[in-house]
Design a protein with these regions (language model features):
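The feature marks the mature, well-folded catalytic cores of soluble enzymes
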Residues: 1-137
Length: 137
């Protein structure tokens, strides 16, 4: 992964680097399962991946460095991660305020297994940062 230092002093400044995660490889064809995850509709993996790639390409075309953290996982962790149906949203995994980085905490039990994967990558990428626990709502 390219080296950079996380820094954010305003939510209105230009994005330079963002962390995304590709969608799960699983469909969510049942509305009950979707509602249990907090969604209001079912999910088709192919459509979700097309939307993700379009979003990623748009950011890259605007000059933003995009890190897909699913590409950085070890093979065994990646196998597990690809089966997590609610890993689309990375905004609450961690945040940067100034030069400090803060861990997020899963607001739903359905997302708890995703957090250690992302947090271990952040620790690897930024060992000098003291990552603090913070509940991001």
């Amino acid at each position: 992964m390219d080296s950079f230092q996380p820094n954010c002093c305003s939510e209105h400044e230009e994005l330079k680097v963002v962390m995304l995660c590709a969608p799960s490889k699983l469909d969510v064809p049942d509305l009950t399962i979707a509602e249990n995850v907090g969604w209001d509709a079912t999910v088709n993996h192919v459509k979700a991946m097309d939307n993700f790639m379009g979003f990623k390409t748009t950011l890259e075309n605007a000059g933003v460095k995009v890190i897909d953290y699913s590409e950085e996982l070890s093979p065994d962790v990646k196998t597990i991660s690809e089966q997590l149906i609610n890993r689309y949203f990375v905004r609450d995994l961690a945040c940067v305020i100034g030069n400090s980085m803060f861990y997020g905490a899963a607001g739903s039990s359905l997302r708890r297994s995703e957090y250690p994967h992302a947090h271990s990558l952040l620790e690897k990428w930024f060992p000098e940062k003291k990552l603090n626990n913070l509940l991001l709502l």
